[in-house]
Amino acid sequence: MNYIRITRENIDREHICCAMSGKQSLAKKEWLKQLFDEGLVFYRSEERGKCFIEYIPAENAWVPIEADGYLYINCLWVSGSMKGHGYSTDLLDACVKDAEASGKKGICILCAEGRKREFLADPKFLAYKGFKVTDVSDCGINLCVLTLTENEELPRFKACAKHPQVSEKGFVLYYTDQCPFTCYWVPRVKEVAEEYNIPLKVIHINDRESAQNVPAPVTTYALFRDGRFLTQSIQSDKKFLALAGIRD
């Protein structure tokens, strides 16, 4: 398999795997353009399909972690017909090579406790590749690290991510444009919340400083109810109604 690096120069003519076209693709591409100057790297397969990796120096990552000197993987996604061919290893190897070449201490990424969860890395794959859990949030989301040097300080969650909570009653949703699916589903969830008079506060994160202080380990999509973290899984309008106890 051959891979393409998406850059500011070619992004307008290349697809980005998780969103092939339309408004979702445009929102994601604008978000990527914003971060290219901060060291974001995006590799994808030459073939059409979901096979890509996206990473950035951890100091510039839109997550509340303390990981100076590391790379942070926003997303490593290989699915459908692309699975089972070693492409995840190829993409991860490219990240490791970049980390070594730039003198990074290691690589970090989020995964779930014990099993694969939607929009998080597979913990079994990470363990197989040598990643270790270095911190755990109260909601069962782990910070995993592959170290490339010895005796270095390991990445940790900030307190706001380690103990996720909000003060508001009802539903509270934090999200960024890092995942194009939020562009499609968040407006639909807002519509049904208004239609059924469901208390919902939506916070669109537009800058790094805000993202690094979100009260959750995940910023792409973090849904709370009555102060408690519910899920990082992007909800459709029907799934959201089900969470609210409404069967449409």
What annotation goes with each model-predicted range?
Residues 78, 84-100:
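Conserved acetyl-CoA-binding loop-helix of GNAT-fold acetyltransferases
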Residues 44, 48-59, 72, 77:
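Conserved beta-strand in the GNAT
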Residues 160-195:
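Local sequence-structure signature of Cys/Sec-based thiol-disulfide redox active-site neighborhoods
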Residues 97-118:
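Conserved GNAT acetyl-CoA-binding A-motif
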Residues 226-248:
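Non-catalytic, surface beta->alpha helical segment in thiol-disulfide oxidoreductase systems
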Residues 1-48, 160, 181, 188-192:
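Short amphipathic alpha-helix that is part of the acyltransferase structural core
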Residues 138-163:
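C-terminal "cap" of GNAT-fold acetyltransferases
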Residues 113-138:
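Conserved active-site alpha-helix within GNAT-family acetyltransferase domains
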